[in-house]
């Protein structure tokens, strides 16, 4: 069974995540995002690579969205309402609840405020979300007769999932964005040990290994505190869901401990709704937040207030969380234009910014001016501080997950090409797993392993207790355990399979036992050579056998002998069917037969007793 992985977005870049995997002719789309740093046709994935005719319903079996970030869900309303896809769409309950907020906020910023072309409307968003089927963690969904999917906790943001998809014997995992460590409000990614043909993993921080979070938190708090203590304003661009809550919890706690009276603001609107959903979806948060929730709501911040636009020009220090996080548009960019020219102020960038955004330009080096989308230039005299509070896993986390799942192949997406190539070599050399880094529009093909599921008979299982059955010395079951046992695999016409003991074959097949034997009439003495009787001759032959076959257990009678299944008796026939036609008629013959199980023993005895030996 073949597996084809077509990368429509996030191939050797970060943005517009969209991967289409074909298993035995059926296509699954993982994520349907937009590129936050593009404002042309490159904003969306090239959907024509799926179907040139535009018949997406027949081309795609289902779409699975891993989380609500725009680079993973931003193109979905366009694909369903403009391109016409009407098939099943799956996402977690939090993602279904929060995606409409993110999509509408983006539409409002880009169209209502910036006057860009409207690629999807508010109605499109609403109609798109009506088609979404919400799923629980570890709930196995039977998409159709052959395809099943299951979601696993990914950390990263509220409701983010990794997706396991299985069709027949082929199985894959698409990680989406994930975090292998806990933070203040979310837990670490959790997934079962699975047999996989393919792992498709994000690689945002393909070469970064982060140390303890506490020095980073301290550095961030000191930078913000120093700014406001000097009378400046600190702008923290962040997405309304995820990093904003993480940093609000951090600052709110620090403000309490340090008794700081400088106001902390949240840009009004979307973040208020986001905090409401966090309170409703507390079960998706970290264990620490769940425990705190028993006594108080950890998202009811004591020192955080709503921000009014009139406060942009208000005197005095303050801290402001404003969306979006990459300074690509919206309120955060508007505030940046006003605050960037002052050397007292600070822009604290807590996460990754894609190429083409103002955030990325600031991270690349401290510029003196920044060009905005409409040709406006902004003088940058403020301090710029970058601290890695990213909810993405680092290189160690990617390696740990890959080693844990031990897939047959790995495809890396959602990263920067130079770093991805380094990680690719690391996975190949250290884990001995083939790894691929396709660009957008490229397809990588794999062959999946065919497995046969078989029941085992009682007799076969009992036979496994013999010394030939090798159990692992490990106290835990491992996929790599080497276990061997002799049995016969029987596959019926119905394709049901069973492993049975060899002694059960005739019963299972409703056939009689057949025994394969060998026979040979062997010359052992020349007639008249001596006057020995039959008994003496048998004794002489037994002595020859003992010289050749050490320790042989020989049973003798008047005119025959037996060793294991080998039986030999003096032949009185003038012509015997087991005798060679070239044999001398002047010889005495021993007519022998033995089981094929004693093939080597039989011929060893023949060579020992035959005439002229």
Swiss-Prot record:
Sequence motif: HXHXDH motif, positions: 67-72
InterPro entries, per database record: Beta_Casp, INTS11-like_MBL-fold, MBL, Metallo-B-lactamas, RibonucZ/Hydroxyglut_hydro, RMMBL
EC number: 3.1.27.-
Signal peptide: none
UniProt keyword annotations, A-Z: Hydrolase, mRNA processing, Nuclease, Nucleus
Enzyme class: hydrolase
Pfam families: Beta-Casp (PF10996), Lactamase_B_6 (PF16661), RMMBL (PF07521)
Localisation: Nucleus
GO annotation, biological process: mRNA processing; polar nucleus fusion
CDD domains documented for this protein: INTS11-like_MBL-fold
Function: Component of the cleavage and polyadenylation specificity factor (CPSF) complex that play a key role in pre-mRNA 3'-end formation, recognizing the AAUAAA signal sequence and interacting with poly(A) polymerase and other factors to bring about cleavage and poly(A) addition. May function as mRNA 3'-end-processing endonuclease and also be involved in the histone 3'-end pre-mRNA processing.
Family listed: Belongs to the metallo-beta-lactamase superfamily. RNA-metabolizing metallo-beta-lactamase-like family. INTS11 subfamily.
Record-given protein name: Cleavage and polyadenylation specificity factor subunit 3-II
């Amino acid at each position: 069974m073949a597996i084809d992985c077509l990368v429509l977005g996030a191939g050797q870049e970060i943005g517009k995540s969209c991967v289409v995997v074909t298993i035995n002719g059926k296509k699954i789309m993982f994520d349907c995002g937009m590129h936050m740093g593009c404002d042309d046709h490159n904003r969306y994935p090239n959907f024509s690579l799926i179907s040139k005719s535009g018949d997406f319903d027949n081309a795609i079996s289902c779409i699975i969205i891993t989380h609500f970030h725009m680079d993973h869900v931003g193109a979905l309303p366009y694909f369903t309402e403009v391109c016409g896809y009407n098939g099943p769409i799956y996402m977690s309950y939090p993602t279904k609840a929060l995606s409409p907020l993110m999509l509408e906020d983006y539409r409002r910023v880009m169209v209502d405020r910036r006057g860009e072309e409207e690629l999807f409307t508010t109605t499109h968003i609403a109609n798109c979300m009506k088609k979404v089927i919400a799923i629980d963690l570890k709930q196995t969904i039977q998409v159709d007769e052959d395809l099943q999917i299951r979601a696993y906790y990914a950390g990263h943001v509220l409701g983010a999932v990794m997706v396991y998809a299985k069709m027949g014997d082929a199985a894959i995992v698409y990680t989406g964005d994930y975090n292998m460590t806990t933070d203040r409000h979310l837990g670490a990614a959790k997934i079962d040990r699975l047999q996989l043909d393919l792992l498709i993993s994000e690689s945002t921080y393909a070469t970064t290994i982060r140390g303890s979070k506490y020095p980073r938190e301290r550095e961030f708090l000191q930078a913000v505190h120093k700014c406001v203590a000097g009378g400046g304003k600190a702008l923290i661009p962040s997405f309304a869901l995820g990093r904003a809550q993480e940093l609000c919890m951090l600052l709110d706690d620090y403000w309490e401990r340090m008794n700081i009276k400088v106001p902390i603001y949240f840009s009004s609107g979307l973040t208020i709704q986001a905090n409401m959903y966090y309170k409703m979806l507390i079960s998706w948060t970290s264990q620490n937040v769940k425990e705190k929730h028993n006594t108080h709501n950890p998202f009811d911040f004591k020192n955080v207030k709503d921000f009014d636009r009139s406060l942009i020009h208000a005197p005095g220090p303050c801290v402001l969380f404003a969306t979006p996080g990459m300074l690509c548009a919206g309120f955060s960019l508007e505030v940046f234009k006003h605050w960037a020219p002052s050397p007292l102020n600070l822009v604290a960038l807590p996460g990754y910014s894609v190429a083409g955004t103002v955030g990325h330009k600031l991270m690349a080096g401290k510029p003196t001016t920044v060009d905005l989308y409409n040709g406006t230039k902004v003088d940058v005299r403020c301090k710029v501080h970058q601290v890695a509070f990213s909810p993405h896993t680092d290189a160690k986390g990617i390696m740990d997950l890959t080693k844990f799942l031990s897939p047959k192949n790995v495809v890396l997406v959602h990263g920067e090409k130079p770093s991805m190539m380094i990680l690719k070599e690391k996975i190949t050399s250290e884990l001995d797993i083939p790894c691929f880094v396709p660009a957008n529009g490229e397809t990588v093909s794999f062959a999946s392993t065919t497995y046969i599921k078989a029941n085992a008979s009682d007799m076969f299982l009992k036979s496994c207790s013999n010394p030939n059955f090798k159990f692992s010395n490990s106290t835990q079951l491992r996929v790599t355990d080497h276990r061997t046992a002799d049995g016969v695999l029987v596959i019926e016409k119905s394709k049901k399979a069973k492993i049975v003991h060899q002694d059960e074959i005739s019963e299972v097949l409703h056939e009689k036992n057949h025994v394969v034997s060998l026979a040979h009439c062997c010359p052992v003495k020349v007639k008249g050579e001596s006057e020995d009787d039959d008994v003496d001759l048998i004794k002489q032959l037994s002595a020859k056998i003992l010289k050749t076959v050490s320790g042989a257990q020989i049973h003798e009678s008047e005119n025959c002998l037996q060793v294991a299944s080998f039986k030999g008796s003096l032949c009185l026939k003038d012509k015997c069917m087991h005798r060679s036609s070239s044999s001398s008629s002047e010889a005495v013959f021993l007519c022998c037969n033995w089981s094929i199980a004693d093939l080597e023993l039989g011929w060893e005895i023949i060579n020992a007793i035959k005439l002229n030996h």
